[in-house]
């Protein structure tokens, strides 16, 4: 039944920029070689389960508008299986390699920890079968530690250690399932790992517990032999007012505090970056500089709204800047572009799921083409290198040399009567270079 939901749609193929086929790629040519690598291997696209197959089209003002067959009635074993079948069939029709899930996205509803584990185990068995049937792979798995009322005050940072333990059970099973299914990464998004009021919150206790939880996850990864990457997904707020994983730089400081900076990387979401007051490319550049760039959740926010709207990306210009940072970082190792995006509430047809993903995929592919052209042209990177060339000279090396003191550097400035010559940052010229490609 569920796979038939997409029976009227053919597999999406590349037809080139001049195609007028709404169900074809204009820029995503998966076998095109760019900078020595196939486009599919550069981008590693994934479809998410939660927005695409679990969200009913509801919002805080109204009920769901979608009539997906697997959303009719309770989320029992039958509907959960139908949802899984539809999801993997859809990923195959898009001709992208990966999908992503939370545990609760793929399983029947359950009461109690025993029933929860049993229901999830049944789902994992089925997913393993479906991956083989459809030739798709898992980019990453995760556990939903924010949706159930037990997590109203968080999981790892909850005042109640019993909730911490419940969360540990979910993460153990989700991590082991990710390992079994050949997942490339495991993600931790702390949607409620934060607080709403300082009046009832002990920040010190919560951060220690958060660090302990993450350390336990890393330890379990090694115990079971999982070779993928553990990822944290930064977000400044929503649903809590203050979240501890505010942005990439905050996460890195947290990882350093608990000695995990070589064990954990970040999964950066575009909309979360803008909520934190940064641009998407800033967060990618920061992760690159800190050596913790792992994976990307592709979406966009609304410039007029201060919340996480999770729209499909549609700005080639903005994503070209992001792709420059990804290329400079050496590209993905285990990560990829997961579409953490949803069609709008009025987009109720099955075709809309294709339009949203096709548009996002083509936007990112087009941005890759433009970013590669900028890299191959070399002017922008040459200017950046020239701007910082002084740090490769005698004084720059002296400043960083072991044993050099603040007084030593100050004495050089005085002895040489330094009078630095100002040089233009040429920002407008740089912006013009971007617009030429």
UniProtKB/Swiss-Prot annotation:
One of its GO terms (molecular function) is magnesium ion binding. Its main location: cytoplasm. Mg(2+) 2 binds at residues 269, 272, 308, 310. It catalyses: alpha-D-xylose = alpha-D-xylulofuranose. The active site is at residues 102, 105. It is found in: Cytoplasm. Binds 2 magnesium ions per subunit. Mg(2+) 1 binds at residues 233, 269, 297, 340. Keywords: Carbohydrate metabolism, Cytoplasm, Isomerase, Magnesium, Metal-binding, Xylose metabolism. Its EC number is 5.3.1.5. InterPro entries: Xyl_isomerase-like_sf, Xylose_isom_bac, Xylose_isomerase. It comes from the Bacteria. GO terms for biological process: D-xylose metabolic process. GO terms for cellular component: cytoplasm. HAMAP family: Xylose_isom_A. Belongs to the xylose isomerase family. PANTHER family: PTHR48408, XYLOSE ISOMERASE. This is Xylose isomerase. It comes from Novosphingobium aromaticivorans (strain ATCC 700278 / DSM 12444 / CCUG 56034 / CIP 105152 / NBRC 16084 / F199). The gene is xylA.
